Amino acid sequence: MSSSSPNPFRRSLKFVEQWYRETPQRALDGAYEAARAIEEIEKKHFKGQPVPLRIRTESVMTNYFQSEVQKNLQFIQTRLREFKSSSLVVEVADKLKPPSIPPAPTPLDTPNTIDFTDEYDVTSEEYSSELVSPSIDAQGSLDKLAFIDAVLKRYRSASIQREAAAAASKAARASAPKSGSEMKKNIPQPLPIQSAQNSLYESEFISDDITEDPSKLDSSSFIPRSILRTATRFRKELNPDPGTEDDILNDFRNSRVRTRAAVSFVLGLMIVPLLTQQVSKNLVIGPFVDKLKGPEQIEIRINPEIENEVLTELARFEERLKFESLTSPIPLSPAEIQFQLKAKAEDLKEEYQWDLRQPLKNAISDLFSLVALAIYFVLNRQKIAVLKSFFDEIIYGLSDSAKAFIIILFTDVFVGFHSPHGWEVIVESVLSHFGLPQDRNFINMFIATFPVMLDTVFKYWIFRYLNQISPSAVATYRNMNE
C-alpha cells in the first residue's frame, strides 16, 4: 500500500498545476467580458459614446451606469494584473522545468504488490499536451487584449471624458426646465476626487488635473500673475456663452472638492502614523517585549545614563538612611540598613524596568508607523498632486508681505539666532526616544552643521526659484529682513 500513497498526492499537484496554467486565459476572459459589458452600456444607453464619469447628475440611471462602468473598470484592471503575473510565473516555470525522466520499470513478478502507477502517472509530454487547450490561440488572445485596450483608452483619456461631460452637460441644459431651482438641480456636477460614495478607482482612468498646464505654477512670466488672473476673470465674466456659468460652478465645485481632499489627506498624514504607532506599541509590541528576558540589561549597557540614574537614586536613598540613623535616638543597625537598601533596589528595578524597555518598543512601533505611512502614500498617490496644487494656490494667492513674513518666520525659527536651543531640545528628545546616550559632542556637532546646511538650502531656494516666481516678494523679504 505504500507505493500507492504518492499517486493521489501527485494527481492533486497536477490538478493544481493545470488549474494555475489556465489562470492567464481565465483572467483574460474575465477582463474581456467586463469590457464587453461596458461596450453594451455605451451602445444601449449612451449612443455608442463613453459614459461620462466626470459629472454627477440627479439622474438615478446615469449614476447607476457610472457605478457599473467604474466597477467593471476596476475588475478589468484586477484581472489584467492577474493575467500578467500568472503568465510570467507560467513562463518562468516552463523555462526552469527539468527534462522529463521516464519512470523506472516496475517488476511485475513481485508477489502481493498492486501496481497503481499506470492509473495516474502520465509523462511530461502527455501532461503538457493536456494543459494546452486547443480552444486557446494566440490570435484570439491578442484580439481580446486589443479590444480591452480600446475600451480602457476611452476612460484613460481626459480629453475624451471632457467631451463626454460637455455633451452630457449640453443635453442636460437642453432638457432642463426653465425654473431656476430645477435648472440648478439638473446641472451636472463634477465627481469628487476619490469620494467615499463613488469608486476610488476612477482616478486611475481620468486625468483630473488641477490646471490644463501643470507647469504653469512653476514657470516665470514677464507679466505678473495677478494681472493675468484678473484678465482671465474679466474674460470669463464678459463671455456671452451661456455655458460659462456652468463652467464657473464646476470650477467652484472642483475647488471645493480639492480643498476637502487636501485637508483630509493632511489629517491622514498626522493621524495614520500616530495611531499606528500607539496601537502597535500598546497592543502588539508592548506585550511581546515585556515577555522578553533581559532587554533592560542590554539597554543599561548601551545607555550608561540610565544606569547612572539608578545608581544615583540608590546612593541618595542610602545617604538618607544614614542621616536618619545618626539623627534618630534609636540608630538603625547595619543589618536593617542593608535590608532597606535591598528592598529599595528591588523597587528601583521594578520602577525602571518599564523605562528601560521603552526604547525598543519605540523603535519597532516607529517602524510600523513608517510602513503605514508608506502604504498611505501609495494608496493616495493622486491626492499628493492635489495637495501640491492646493498649497500652490494658497502660496501664490498670498500677498508679497505675507510671503515675506512666512519666510522670515520659518528662517528665524529653524536657522535664526535662538534656533540652537530649540535644536538641542529636539536632538535630546530624539536620542531619549530611542534610548541612545546623549553625547554632548554629537549634539554640538549636529547643531553646528545642520542649521547651516538648512540655511543654505533656504537661501538657494530664494535665489533660484522665488526670485523668478515672485521678485516683489524677494524685495519685500530683503527690506523686512534689514
UniProtKB/Swiss-Prot annotation:
It holds the Pfam family CemA. Keywords: Cell inner membrane, Cell membrane, Hydrogen ion transport, Ion transport, Membrane, Transmembrane, Transmembrane helix, Transport. It is found in: Cell inner membrane. Belongs to the CemA family. Its main location: membrane. The chain crosses the membrane at residues 265-285, 359-379, 406-426, 442-462. One of its GO terms (molecular function) is proton transmembrane transporter activity. Required for H(+) efflux immediately after light irradiation to form a rapid H(+) concentration gradient across the thylakoid membranes. Together with PxcL, contributes to transient H(+) uptake following dark to light transition. InterPro entries: CemA. One of its GO terms (cellular component) is plasma membrane. This is Proton extrusion protein PxcA. It comes from Acaryochloris marina (strain MBIC 11017). The keyword Hydrolase does not apply.
